[in-house]
């Protein structure tokens, strides 16, 4: 029996890996061979999913902690997202181990620009809002052209990085949340968010009695280095200390020991949100798509303090547009306590969040995403 092979191509962007792995694992469970090209920092997660892994010849986004935020962004744009040389590595892997379809992270524009050279069907995996990816592509092309012009390279026309020739674009969100007005092209499939551990039965070490009547607020400002700064995290804890609530903060890459938790709060480094969300009344988020979808999948309304990534302010705007929460500017965190209190008291936010919960659970992005990727084989 012939086995169909899918090659995933990714980079270490934090929240971009779980959707790719969720779909890849489902394809593997359906009997397909699945391989992943990624960064060494992703090796353990990919291998633990039972998938074959090949590392890029050098680190891409990982190992950039010593750079300033501006330096990191410039590096990502030039050496990761717009790096057409990465396509050579993809083609080399495929020459050694052919695949029937290649699933490429939407941010790897340099690889997608040369997809005509890839001897397989090409699937673009959008791990967030399609509208934010389109906005970022325009910015990337403009910024990349500035970099190219500065070193005497010819600029790229927009259509050189277009997706028109791609076989399939899989978007792991809901069209209702994305808010794209135009009817999507026939090769664009909204499959819903990919949430592998949606109904986790894992517990978490709550310091409070089960009978404590105060609402529980989950705060997560990003697992990515350079976003969830200790200054912002401490400011959030201090502001929420005056509210009659219980606060659970997860800090990701920040050490909890760097923060002073007030009496109504507890701080963890990493703890699965799925274990806490069934008890949560409101989530305070940086606007990462995965975190937001995880909360909405449990019917939890949100307060968004947008992070530095380009899509996060757009996610915050969509949170307000669909009525599932409010947005607070990073320089107006002093308003956070009042905003959280408003979202807690106004039941319309919870009602809207529960509507989104029903949509997410009906779509099931894991099975829908895997089926969409399989359909790319029919277009060869």
What is the meaning of each model-derived region?
Residues 8-10, 28-32, 37, 151-153, ...:
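Catalytic-core helical/loop segments in enzymes performing group transfer/polymerization on anionic/lipid-linked
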Residues 1-134, 138, 142-146, 248-303, ...:
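Glycosyltransferase specificity loop/lid
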Residues 117-187:
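Active-site-proximal region of nucleotide-activated glycan assembly enzymes
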Residues 178, 182-282:
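Donor-nucleotide binding loops and adjacent catalytic segments primarily
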